[in-house]
């Protein structure tokens, strides 16, 4: 796939995959989630990079399963996706071993993978299923997330694309190809903020900060992948600042409630994605009623 892709697509692909791994590690650090990578077979290239983002890597000892960076002979790992950084800085693999590992298309198996710190646990094939289940249960028991809480279903985004306009319920994108810019308009909340985290959770995916984060994230990814010639993104907002501050206060005052925490983390990931998008970013304050209320 990548051999037939443009350079720009490769850059966006690698950036997106690394942002995904960063989100996994951020969830482990702040969200009470733990990720377990159970490798039975070959984890090569991006497959092993995904495993590196996990908190614990298990490998079956069957003389065939292996981990590697190169996916095939003469196909090396793509740079700037965090692989070498994770094995050296996160897993504390010796740099000389990391250099050798990066050249081995056949990968590293069994006891050698464990000794090189490329995995955390080597498991005999005869006990693989039971050990993975037991390890997953032990890791899950470490979480502070409520056992009886009901999740919030995330429905499809209300999204329409017509010509140079991309519209969501809360976000609008208008593209000016002559000037090479995209204007992103954020619509503030129409209703006052809920007074409790439970009331916010009851709103589900219609809760304004959650809905905004999802739509804005989707819009930025659309601009990254589908509009490579747009070099400037202008952000505008419309709405009532006092109403917005009510939502801000709710998120600020209840950081330990699981739903509020997840919304805050979603917004953080989205803003980081915007910050790392290779476009010039401008906020048009003159047209912003939200900011004028501060």
Identify the function of each model-found stretch:
Residues 1, 68, 77, 192-196, ...:
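Short acidic/His/Gly/Ser-rich catalytic and metal-binding motifs that mark active-site loops
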Residues 288-293:
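Conserved small/polar residues in nucleotide/adenosyl-binding loops
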Residues 39-40, 60-63, 123-126, 285-287:
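Short beta->alpha connector loops at strand-helix junctions that form conserved
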Residues 1-8, 22-36, 60-64, 181-184, ...:
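A structural preference for short, pocket-lining loop segments at secondary-structure junctions
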Residues 2-30, 34, 40-56, 61-112:
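Hydrophobic, small-residue-rich alpha-helical packing segments that form membrane-like cores
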Residues 11, 15, 82, 127, ...:
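Conserved active-site and cofactor/substrate-binding residues in soluble primary-metabolism enzymes
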Residues 49-53, 83, 92-204, 208, ...:
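Amphipathic alpha-helical segments at domain termini/boundaries
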Residues 41-43, 239-241, 287:
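Active-site-proximal loop/turn and secondary-structure-junction residues that shape catalytic pockets
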């Amino acid at each position: 796939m990548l051999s037939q892709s443009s350079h720009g697509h490769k850059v966006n692909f690698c950036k997106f995959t690394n942002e995904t791994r960063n989100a996994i590690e951020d969830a482990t650090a702040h969200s009470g989630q733990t990720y377990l990578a159970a490798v039975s077979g070959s984890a090569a290239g991006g497959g092993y990079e995904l495993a590196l983002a996990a908190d614990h890597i298990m490998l079956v000892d069957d003389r065939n399963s292996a981990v590697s960076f190169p996916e095939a002979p003469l196909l090396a790992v793509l740079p700037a996706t965090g692989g070498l950084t994770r094995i050296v800085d996160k897993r504390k693999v010796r740099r000389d071993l990391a250099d050798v590992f990066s050249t081995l298309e056949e990968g590293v198996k069994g006891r050698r993978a464990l000794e090189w710190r490329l995995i955390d646990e080597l498991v005999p094939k005869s006990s693989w299923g039971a050990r993975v289940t037991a390890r997953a249960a032990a890791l899950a028991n470490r979480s502070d997330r409520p056992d009886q809480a009901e999740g919030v279903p995330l429905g499809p985004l209300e999204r329409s694309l017509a010509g140079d306009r991309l519209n969501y319920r809360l976000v609008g994108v208008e593209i000016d190809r002559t000037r090479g810019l995209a204007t992103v308009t954020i619509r503030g909340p129409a209703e006052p903020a809920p007074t409790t985290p439970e009331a916010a959770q009851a709103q589900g995916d219609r809760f304004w900060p959650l809905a905004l984060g999802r739509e804005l994230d989707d819009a930025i990814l659309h601009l990254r992948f589908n509009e490579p010639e747009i070099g400037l993104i202008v952000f505008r907002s419309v709405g009532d600042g006092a109403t917005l501050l009510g939502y801000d206060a709710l998120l600020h005052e209840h950081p330990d409630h699981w739903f509020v925490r997840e919304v805050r983390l979603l917004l953080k990931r989205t803003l980081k994605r915007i910050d790392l998008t290779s476009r010039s970013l401008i906020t048009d304050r003159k047209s912003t009623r939200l900011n004028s209320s501060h």
